[in-house]
């Protein structure tokens, strides 16, 4: 490995709490870690400057990893600039939706959660629990702890397409509605 690649690899490791080049693909399969540890705590724009040039250094950091992270963060301009995919176009949104290893049902729930504002998060979670008659789960003031509880609970959810659409409708958020309708139309959820 030449000097430039060694320096870039070292810079990336110093920026990340985990060695990003070795871990990102595995982290993506563990949703609570990627969203709680990375998106809630890190300066993503700083980290991102080092991830793109590092794509050639390791097969574990792929284009799909970067697109997925940018999509969750609503960084439409960067997706368009680096990957020539306009998230506001239906066909391009379908392409972006394919860049993920997260199961479709779980991904849509996670996307919906991340797209909501701080005020909407508790409403969103409470609606899910109400639908499932499991509202005994109590949320606190710590957003990170709420997220950990939420993601640990996601796999137990048995949400149908109709229930998700009802949740989306009740949030009355145009951006969420448009994004989720595209994803739902692209990939049917199993009831």
From Swiss-Prot:
It comes from the Viruses. Keywords: Host membrane, Membrane, Transmembrane, Transmembrane helix. The keyword Membrane applies. It is found in: Host membrane. The chain crosses the membrane at residues 50-72. Pfam families: Herpes_U15. Signal peptide: none annotated. One of its GO terms (cellular component) is membrane. InterPro entries: Herpes_U15. It is a single-pass membrane protein. This is Protein U15. It comes from Human herpesvirus 6B (strain Z29) (HHV-6 variant B). The lineage of its organism: Viruses, Duplodnaviria, Heunggongvirae, Peploviricota, Herviviricetes.
């Amino acid at each position: 490995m030449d000097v430039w690649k060694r320096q870039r690899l070292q810079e990336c490791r110093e920026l990340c709490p985990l060695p990003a080049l070795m871990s990102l693909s595995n982290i993506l399969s563990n949703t609570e870690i990627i969203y709680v540890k990375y998106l809630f705590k890190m300066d993503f724009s700083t980290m991102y400057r080092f991830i793109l040039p590092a794509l050639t250094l390791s097969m574990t950091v792929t284009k799909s990893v970067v697109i997925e992270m940018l999509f969750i963060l609503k960084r439409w301009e960067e997706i368009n600039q680096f990957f020539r995919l306009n998230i506001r176009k239906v066909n391009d949104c379908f392409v972006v939706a394919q860049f993920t290893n997260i199961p479709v049902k779980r991904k849509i729930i996670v996307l919906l959660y991340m797209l909501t504002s701080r005020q909407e998060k508790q409403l969103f979670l409470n609606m899910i629990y109400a639908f499932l008659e499991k509202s005994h789960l109590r949320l606190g003031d710590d957003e990170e702890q709420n997220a950990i509880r939420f993601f640990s609970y996601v796999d137990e959810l048995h949400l149908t397409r109709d229930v998700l659409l009802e949740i989306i409708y009740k949030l009355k958020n145009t951006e969420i509605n448009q994004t989720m309708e595209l994803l739902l139309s692209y990939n049917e959820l199993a009831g």
